[in-house]
């Protein structure tokens, strides 16, 4: 059985330092036509408790994408529901 390789992305912080993250999942919301991504720092990916970061993103023409902070409570609630669903599926 082959191990599934996780997608990894580099996200610069506000100081321009680059950090490697492992993508947990992405999802689209049809009603708002927005896309979201949840990531964890690559060095924490195998730990039992990890800090999850979530962003809204827009894909660019050159296969890159731009990340935007999630600012509204409604958006956060939606992302948290997706994280909870994912956690429940992994426990099953």
From Swiss-Prot:
Pfam families listed in its UniProt record: DUF1292
InterPro entries according to UniProt: UPF0473 (IPR009711)
TM regions (residue ranges): none
Family assignment from sequence similarity: Belongs to the UPF0473 family.
Name this polypeptide is given: UPF0473 protein OB2006
Species assigned in the record: Oceanobacillus iheyensis (strain DSM 14371 / CIP 107618 / JCM 11309 / KCTC 3954 / HTE831)
């Amino acid at each position: 059985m082959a191990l599934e390789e996780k997608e990894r992305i580099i996200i610069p912080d506000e100081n321009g330092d680059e950090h490697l993250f492992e993508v947990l999942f992405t999802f689209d919301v049809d009603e708002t036509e927005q896309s979201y991504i949840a990531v964890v720092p690559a060095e924490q990916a195998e730990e039992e408790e990890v800090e999850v970061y979530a962003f809204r993103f827009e894909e660019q023409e050159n296969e890159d994408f731009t990340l935007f902070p999630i600012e509204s409570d409604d958006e956060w609630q939606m992302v948290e529901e997706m994280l909870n669903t994912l956690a429940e599926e992994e426990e099953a």
